[in-house]
Structure formats: C-alpha cells, structure tokens
C-alpha cells in the first residue's frame, strides 16, 4: 500500500462515517417533530422512546467521526476542532443536553418537568443538523485560518495553525451557502425522522401525520439542497495538481466526470432518496421508506465528501491564504500510522455486523402504547 493510497483510503473511511452520521440524524429530525406528530403526552412519549432506542448510535458515530479525523488527518483536527471551537462546542453541547434529556425527563424528582427536557431534545434536533451541515459546507466554501509549519520550532508558541478572527468558527454562519446546506441537512433529518417513525411505531394517527407532512418537508429539502448542489458543480474549486494550491473552474464537476463511478453512485443515491420519500408519502401503510431514503442519503453524502478530497483537491480551503488550505497529503498522519490503522480497520466489518445485529434485536417489535405503559420507558 502506497502512502497516497493510504491517504485516500482513510479519507474514504472518514467520509463513510460522515455519511452514516447524516443518516443517523433521523434521531434529531424526529425529535424536532415531537409536538407536531405527538398531540398528547402519550403520543409524545411514543416518539421519544422510539428515538431513545437509537440516540446512542448517532452520538457514538459523531465521536468516532471526530476521532477518525484526529487519527488520520491531525492537522485538520487541530485547525478546525481547535480553531473553530465555538462551532464544534455548540454542536457537542447540543448532543450532551440530548443525552441528559432522555435520561432525566421522567425521573422522580425532576422539578423542571418533562416538557423542559422535550424542548431540549428539539433544540438538539435543530442545532445539531443545522450546524453540522454548515461545518461540512466549509469543505467547499472554505474557512478563515492560517497554517505556518515553521512555528513548530517556536519554543514560546509552537502552534502551526491558528484562526484568523475571534469568532472561532461562528463566522461559517455568515456564508449564506453554509447556512443553505445546514438547512438542507436539517430538512433531510426531519424527513428521515418521519420515515423512521412510520417504520418503528405502531400508531395509526402518528403514521397518518407523518404521511401528510412528508411532502412539505421534502419540498423544503429540495429548495435548499438542489441550489447548493448546482452551485457546487459550477463553482470554482481548489486543485493541488500543479504542486501548489490553485483555483480551478468547476473543480467538483470535473472530479465527478473524472471519477465516473462516483457520478453513478451519486445518481443512484439521489434516486433512492426521492423514491423512499415518494412511496412513503403516497401510502400510510408503506413503512420501508427509511431504508431506501437512508441508503440513498449515505451514498449521496459519501460522494459529496469524496469529491471534496479526492482527485488532487484541497478539502479544507483557507479563505485567508490559499496555500494554507489543507489537502490529504499535507494534513495526514505518518505513513506508519496510517498503515497500522489500516490493518486495525479490517475489523470494521465485524463492528458493522454487530451494529446490524443490535439494531435488528432492538427493532424486533414495533413500539406500541401498551409497551410504554407496561415496561420501562423514557
């Protein structure tokens, strides 16, 4: 395995984790619908207990996503997570209050009341997808940072990456296209949440409400996602093919055309997303939409992240100094580290198999009102 192959391999793994994270944010999407789909306290508890079975998957994937970046591309980790820390801290805090809300909303002695923690779940459901989408958009639109590897010999301040302003990541929200992708991810999370609830909860009224609301949320998703995708394909990108970082017209479109297998996967992903939404919005009884739209989401997001870094592309552009932009080559770990981790990564299929087994065991029976009343529940 060459060094270049290892860099591309680990970018694929990080991108796959990011794609899975977007799919698993159906938990956040469903939580934004607690009061829209649940008209009584019993119905709201059904929704919360449905997502409560899966929130650990989302949180663990988020942490693993960050850990994989730290291990394979440490300069990105120190630049983005260390420089844009306000953005990432808000995201992390929203996930922490989610965990607390699940565990404490119906505990004895909860003087704040269940509704307070339900509102916290809604906050996480909005903030998490919105800001994560905005953070991912910076892979294409850039951020405000500087890299000076010469500082490594500075005994007083051996810091090679620094943020160029005091906002430390919040400036990403000043770029309207970052916000557009954030809103697209939020609407996609809501769609996935509805599809998951249709599949997981045995309750006629809730399923009917999901079916009615799906088309409107799908329309809003397309209104945000399609303009972002079209702009992405025609905008300038950041190429490293000449040895230095240069601007290349329609770089991301060129990446798809030069790697046609990614273009095919992208088209399949988009079709699956739309098929799952269409079928689910046409019938209250149809419950398999989560799998079509979920798989389509993973494929689509995977391709978008791959074209951000593969084919001699700077995946984290600097808007302050073009040559400070991060690439797979200038931000990765050593060849020995990547090679060793690649061997360990061969265990990933076994981990995925365990996750599938655990998922099937948890969802062997759909949630019903009787189960909430008789068993242990959130």
Write out the residue ranges for each language-model feature.
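A generic, lipid-embedded transmembrane alpha helix
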Residues: 52-74, 130, 134, 223-227
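Membrane-interface helix-loop-helix junctions at boundaries between adjacent transmembrane segments
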Residues: 80-88, 97-185
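Membrane-helix interface motif
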Residues: 136-162, 230-244, 307-321
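Hydrophobic alpha-helical transmembrane segments
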Residues: 163-188, 254-271, 331-351
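Short, membrane-exposed interhelical loops at transmembrane-helix boundaries
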Residues: 247-250, 316-337
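Alpha-helical transmembrane segments and their helix-start/interface "positive-inside/aromatic belt" motifs
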Residues: 7-15, 114-132, 208-221, 284-298
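N-terminal signal-anchor module of multipass membrane proteins
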Residues: 1-59, 63-66
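Juxtamembrane interface elements at the cytosolic ends of transmembrane helices
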Residues: 22-35, 96-110, 144-152, 183-204, ...
């Amino acid at each position: 395995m060459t060094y270049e192959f290892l860099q591309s391999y680990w970018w694929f793994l990080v991108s796959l984790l990011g794609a899975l994270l977007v799919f698993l944010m159906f938990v956040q999407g469903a939580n934004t619908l607690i009061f829209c789909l649940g008209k009584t306290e019993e119905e709201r508890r059904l929704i919360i207990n449905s997502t409560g079975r899966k929130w650990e998957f989302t949180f663990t994937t988020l942490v693993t996503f960050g850990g994989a970046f730290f291990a394979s591309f440490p300069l990105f980790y120190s630049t983005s997570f260390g420089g844009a820390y306000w953005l990432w801290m808000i995201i992390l805090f929203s996930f922490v209050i989610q965990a607390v809300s699940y565990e404490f909303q119906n505990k004895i002695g909860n003087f704040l009341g269940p509704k307070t923690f339900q509102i916290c779940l809604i906050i996480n459901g909005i903030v998490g997808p919105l800001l994560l989408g905005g953070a991912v958009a910076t892979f294409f639109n850039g951020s405000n940072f500087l890299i000076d590897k010469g500082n490594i010999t500075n005994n007083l301040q051996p810091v090679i990456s620094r943020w160029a302003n005091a906002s430390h990541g919040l400036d990403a929200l000043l770029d309207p296209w970052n916000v557009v992708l954030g809103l697209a991810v939020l609407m996609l999370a809501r769609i996935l949440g509805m599809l998951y609830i249709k599949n997981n909860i045995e309750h006629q009224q809730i399923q009917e409400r999901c079916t009615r609301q799906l088309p409107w949320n799908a329309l809003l998703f397309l209104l945000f996602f399609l303009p972002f995708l079209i702009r992405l394909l025609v905008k300038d990108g950041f190429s490293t093919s000449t040895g230095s970082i240069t601007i290349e017209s329609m770089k991301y479109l060129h990446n798809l055309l030069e790697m046609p297998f990614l273009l095919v996967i992208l088209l399949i992903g988009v079709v699956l997303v739309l098929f799952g939404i269409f079928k689910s919005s046409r019938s209250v009884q149809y419950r398999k939409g989560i799998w079509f739209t979920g798989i389509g989401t993973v494929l689509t997001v995977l391709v978008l992240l791959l074209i951000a870094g593969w084919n001699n592309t700077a995946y984290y552009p600097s808007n302050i100094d073009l040559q400070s932009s991060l690439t797979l080559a200038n931000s990765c770990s050593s060849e020995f580290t990547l090679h060793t981790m690649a061997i360990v990564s061969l265990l990933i299929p076994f981990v995925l198999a365990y996750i599938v087994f655990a998922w099937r065991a948890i969802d062997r029976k759909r949630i019903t009102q009787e189960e909430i009343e008789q068993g242990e529940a959130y």
